[in-house]
Amino acid sequence: MSDLYCVFGNPIAHSKSPAIHAAFAVQTAQDLRYEARLAALDGFGLAIAEFVAVGGKGANVTVPFKEEAYRLATRLSDRAARAGAVNTLVFDGPEVFGDNTDGAGLVRDITNNLGFSLVGKRILLLGAGGASRGVIAPLLAEKPASLIIANRSADKAVALAQAFADMAPLGGGSFAETAGKSFDLVINATSASLSGASLPLPPGIFAPGSLAYDMMYGKGETPFLTLARQQGAARCADGLGMLVEQAAEAFFVWRGIRPGTAQVLAELRAKLVA
């Protein structure tokens, strides 16, 4: 019988993960099934128990359950412990192993797919929520020159910077406090693009040759990327590649095989803009 995997979320009907993992399974000749499962907002633990009871081997976790998955895990990877959130679970008897592949997915998309080295770069990370926390350690591992966190409420950005101060001296402050500085990479980890909102970014933050990266994606250009282009970003990229790369990393955690991502990403992109 095929090994069973799934993604938990609420909502979840929009998820591209089943199609991505089905493509990975075919490509790597792995015998598995992967489905989307809706968990009640107050019933994530029960949904996990029911899935394990029917033979579930592992699961991805998306909004709004990543922090709850972190608390539910009996063992954590270093990157999940750092992130304070879990997006990948492995079920092995009574043990629940929690991992976080978001940061690895982001870094691999930027460095491999986009060919943009992070070594020695000045990085601005917009947002101080869970999406930002999950990617800071993997970004710092690439040895950038600096990493500054900016947020609407400066105190949250400062607190997040302090949480990773043992890894590198990070900066934290408000969006307005980035005025007069320029960056090689600006990453939008806020949810502003979901609501169609634009961020109050001061002009001049995009250095020559800079990359603007939005973790969100959609049929058209996100408001952040439109603003970035207007303000002089040399290159713009959305988060579809990050989605595929974090899925590939989760597939590797489960199966020990790293699938290729180029064709899967190209097919998803074609469907998105069709």
From Swiss-Prot:
What residue ranges are annotated as transmembrane? none
Which is a Gene Ontology cellular component entry for this protein?
Answer: cytosol
Q: What class of enzyme is it?
A: oxidoreductase
Q: Which InterPro entries match?
A: Aminoacid_DH-like_N_sf, NAD(P)-bd_dom_sf, SDH_C, Shikimate_DH, Shikimate_DH-bd_N, Shikimate_DH_fam, Shikm_DH/Glu-tRNA_Rdtase
Q: Which residues form the active site?
A: 66
Keyword Transferase tagged: no
Task: Give residues annotated as binding shikimate.
Answer: 15-17, 62, 87, 102, 217
Q: Does the keyword Coiled coil apply?
A: no
The cross-references to CDD domains, in alphabetical order and at most eight, read: NAD_bind_Shikimate_DH (cd01065)
Q: Which GO terms describe its molecular function?
A: NADP binding; shikimate 3-dehydrogenase (NADP+) activity
Which BP terms does GO give this entry?
A: amino acid biosynthetic process; aromatic amino acid family biosynthetic process; chorismate biosynthetic process; shikimate metabolic process
Q: Which Gene3D superfamilies match?
A: Leucine Dehydrogenase, chain A, domain 1, NAD(P)-binding Rossmann-like Domain
| UniProt keyword annotations, A-Z | Amino-acid biosynthesis, Aromatic amino acid biosynthesis, NADP, Oxidoreductase
Assembly: Homodimer.
- What does this gene product do? Involved in the biosynthesis of the chorismate, which leads to the biosynthesis of aromatic amino acids. Catalyzes the reversible NADPH linked reduction of 3-dehydroshikimate (DHSA) to yield shikimate (SA).
Q: Which PANTHER family match?
A: BIFUNCTIONAL 3-DEHYDROQUINATE DEHYDRATASE_SHIKIMATE DEHYDROGENASE, CHLOROPLASTIC (PTHR21089:SF1), SHIKIMATE DEHYDROGENASE (PTHR21089)
Question: To which protein family does this belong?
Answer: Belongs to the shikimate dehydrogenase family.
What protein name does the entry list?
Shikimate dehydrogenase (NADP(+))
Q: What is the lineage of its organism?
A: Bacteria, Pseudomonadati, Pseudomonadota, Betaproteobacteria, Rhodocyclales
| GN (gene name) | aroE
